[in-house]
A protein has these predicted regions:
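A structural signal for short, well-ordered beta-strand segments and their strand-loop junctions
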Residues: 39, 99-103, 125, 184, ...
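C-terminal catalytic/acceptor-binding lobe
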Residues: 217, 221, 241-324
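Short catalytic/ligand-binding loop motif for oxyanion handling, primarily in non-cytosolic enzymes
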Residues: 15-16, 47-49, 107-111, 132-135, ...
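GT-A fold catalytic core of metal-dependent nucleotide-sugar glycosyltransferases
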Residues: 79-140
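Substrate-binding rim/cap in mid-to-C-terminal beta-strand-loop elements of soluble/periplasmic
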Residues: 136-148, 152, 179-188
Length: 324
């Protein structure tokens, strides 16, 4: 595992600066060498230089990489991730051999058994089958077609698969390996990530245009276009991809009983109506929760002790204690 590097890619904005600090603290706690942590930041909103806050993260002993956000189309925000990975591997091709690509809003309850996952050429991913698998897409197709019985059958999945260049059969056969979120990537290069990036917006546009033509109340999740582009392009380039239980994650909406069953906590899912008993990161887009906690040690006392998010709060508290 000493060769494994840990990578996130996101805009250089305050919302991600504090998230990086928290997961880096957690990773180091779990024994990960800070030199194996790489943060790829996109200089956005017309900025031509890295922010001071982003440069400050170097003091954690981690690797920070900055690239100008010169994506062709920026209205689909998630495509910045594959864009930045593409730019990073273009500059540092040696890192394409093996890396764990993860979201910035995760922590490890315990380290996954990476040693058992890095021995072969298979790319291992977390289980997101429920919202990007073949069955999910077909459920969406059926909802659209039920409301519009004269519409072409399976048009949505056909148009989506045509964007990337994979067959519907390929997607169907890999229903049980339709994962994402966190990826143990092996033997990739910048050409692959360039295509992943380039296919994101066409996928997003394809879904949006279909929905505009056939609007329904419960549409397909447009925001996961980047996840489909990443997964399907791995198949396009003939990678073996498998969902691994060792990379399973709990959500921020879960309780501690569920949290204890997974190696990873993904701090997503909490909405504004749940913020009175769980940590809601949407309130901290422009505010640093670490600073709030420094000012008031009781800042997050409202968080339910049985909420998985209490574990995130505890890491924040530990980080602040270590800094003092």
């Amino acid at each position: 595992m000493e060769d494994l590097i840990f990578v996130t890619a996101q805009p250089d904005v305050p919302y991600f600066h504090w998230q990086v600090r928290i997961y880096v603290h957690n990773f180091i706690q779990k024994g990960i060498n800070p030199n194996n942590i790489h943060v790829i930041s996109g200089m956005v909103n017309g900025n031509k230089e890295p922010t001071l806050e982003s440069l400050e993260l170097k003091k954690l002993g981690i690797n920070i990489h900055h690239y100008l956000d010169n994506r062709h189309k920026k209205y689909y925000i998630p495509n910045i991730k594959p864009f930045l990975v593409y730019k990073w591997l273009e500059q540092y091709p040696q890192f394409g051999k093996l890396f764990f690509l993860h979201d910035a809003d995760i922590i490890f309850r315990e380290l996954p058994d990476f040693n058992s996952l890095i021995k072969d050429k298979t790319i291992y991913v977390s289980d997101t089958i429920g919202y990007i698998g073949y069955n999910y897409i077909m459920d969406c197709c059926n909802r659209y077609e039920k409301q519009y019985p004269n519409s072409p059958k399976q048009q949505l999945i056909t148009d989506m698969s045509d964007v990337v260049g994979v067959s519907i059969n390929k997607i169907k056969e890999n229903q049980n390996n339709s994962g994402g979120g966190q990826y143990l990537i092996k033997n990739s290069d910048y050409h692959i990530w360039q295509k992943i990036y380039m296919d994101c917006v066409p996928l997003y546009d394809t879904m949006m245009n279909y929905h505009k033509k056939y609007p329904i109340g419960a549409p397909i999740q447009f925001w996961t276009a980047e996840m489909w582009s990443l997964l399907w392009n791995l198949w396009y380039f003939n990678f073996d991809v498998k969902v691994s239980e060792k990379l399973s994650f709990s959500w921020a909406t879960d309780n501690n009983f569920i949290y204890e069953k997974h190696t990873i906590l993904h701090m997503a899912g909490v909405t504004e109506d749940l913020k009175h008993s769980k940590f809601y990161k949407g309130e901290y887009i422009n505010v640093n929760p670490l600073e709030k906690l420094k000012e008031n040690p009781n800042q997050f006392d409202y968080v339910d002790k049985n909420s998985s998010t209490i574990n995130y709060i505890n890491i924040m508290k530990d980080l602040i204690e270590k800094e003092v």
